[in-house]
Regions:
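Phosphate-binding/catalytic loops
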Residues: 1-16, 116-183
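Short, flexible active-site-adjacent loop segments at beta-strand->alpha-helix junctions, enriched
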Residues: 36, 92, 114, 135-136
Length: 183
């Protein structure tokens, strides 16, 4: 019963998120954030880079988190990502800072609380921060993309699957965004 509002609101939130992305100028830089920058955001950033055409594409994609820098992605994250063709072996977590946030035209987060934190702590406009789960093309039970930290490997695999679906929708929306419209 608790998740019913999320399910009912999702279609409208999805339409609004896609419309907002398509109404803005296509970004040249994207920052993907999650709590620790060891599971969701590094995977999402790598998936976005791949979907946009690789690391040398026209859009710079980076990731960061709200907790300690310099940490490796856990074994289960590396393995789950590898099964999806993404290499996280060299990833080290990066702490989100004002400079990192300032350098991004679009910020993608995994949870509503993170969206709020970016807006409050770093003064970013709501239009610059998108909740990735709002783009999910499938019915949902939660806007947030589940944090696999401390959970079974199956949770990591499911989170990565949802991230890939949402990244596909994000890329599709960005490809329909005007290249020359003012941000």
């Amino acid at each position: 019963m608790r998740r019913l509002p999320e399910q009912l609101l999702h279609p409208a939130r999805r339409r609004a998120a896609i419309a907002a992305l398509q109404a803005r100028r296509a970004p040249t830089s994207v920052l993907v954030l999650c709590n620790g920058n060891i599971y969701r955001s590094p995977f999402a950033a790598a998936a976005l880079r791949r979907a946009l055409g690789g690391p040398e594409g026209t859009v710079a994609v980076d990731s960061a988190g709200f907790q300690g820098p310099g940490r490796e992605s856990p074994k289960e994250a590396v393995e789950a990502a590898a099964r999806r063709g993404i290499d996280l072996t060299g990833h080290r977590s990066q702490l989100v800072t004002p400079d990192v946030v300032r350098g991004a035209e679009l910020i993608v987060v995994m949870e509503a609380e993170q969206r709020r934190a970016v807006r409050e702590r770093f003064g970013r406009s709501p239009r610059d921060v998108i909740l990735l789960g709002d783009l999910d093309p499938e019915p949902i039970t939660s806007r947030s993309i589940v944090d696999p930290w401390g959970r079974r490997a199956t949770v990591c695999a499911a989170s990565f699957g949802r991230i890939e679906r949402c990244i596909g929708a994000l890329v599709k929306a960005l490809r329909h965004a005007p290249a020359d419209r003012a941000a």
